[in-house]
């Protein structure tokens, strides 16, 4: 039987009030069931907010250097468990081990950096225009921060949001993407092992349209940080603006790499391959457009197709793999759809453009690395 994981609310691992769970499977092998995770509802968010407020009352009174020491211990624990977490992350979301090891390293670096900032939360003194008066400013914690994070950097992005918030004395409610709940579970375990007071962090799994919405709309969550799609971020921005909340948004992009005729083509190509196919192209900063000077166009495209065709497609836990699976069925269908749109508009599929065949690829969300040529300004795939 698969393990039923739980939310972390009010200092305890608890089942969702809905009683519902969803499956978390390896995108490289559908038969590999990692576990079942809570499909939480608004009542779970309400409980998490109440607990986080209690945690905030305690944590905000803890001296910042002491808060920093907790984060230093978090960083040390991440160092100790780096390989374990990287392998769990690759199993859960598919990207290759060198990338997930880098993901954990981002968390380590962020923890150790945040630790040092605990002794640098400086205020300011300001000259006054009035006699016998002086003015000053100092930093104060805000309250409960709601953090909504994506699947593509399951540990790095949560730490970028969470560690500064914790260092500054805030409590956090953490809502990870539905595709990467296990990595989130491991991160919260480490926070607790490092000595973070239990009610300072809450972990609520579930759908963004339910859990994320309830968190964003809750009047006692004054800070929201979101990384994800532009469409969802726009809705969150509207809600937070209406409710006068503090907000951080990091959303999608359509990124171009420009190669001029005096470029080092080998160096440029390294950048293109990493930008386009790293994390299987599933990054807000991924290179989805390549604009090439006409003098070197044919040469660079030929080099690109040759290198891209030699990228090894497979499970991220395999040391030979260069490109892993897409995160889920919807992601693969979206790629297939836009390749079809490009064909219909007159673009040429130079390589890829289809699902792969072969041993080990039939039970995962794999798609061949694809290059479209003959793309003109104004085509949907170019926009």
Protein language model regions, located:
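Terminal low-complexity tails and localization/encapsulation signals of metabolic enzymes
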Residues: 1-36, 69, 73, 121-148, ...
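Glycine-rich loop-to-alpha-helix module at the N-terminal edge of alpha/beta enzyme cores
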Residues: 30-121, 132
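Residue-level signal for inorganic ion chemistry
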Residues: 31, 67, 89, 111, ...
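Hydrophobic face of alpha-helices
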Residues: 46-49, 68-75, 79, 86, ...
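Generic non-transmembrane alpha-helical segments
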Residues: 73-81, 186, 190-196, 269-270, ...
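Rossmann-like NAD(P) dinucleotide-binding subdomain of oxidoreductase/dehydrogenase enzymes
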Residues: 123-267, 320
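ALDH superfamily catalytic-core signature
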Residues: 223, 231-380
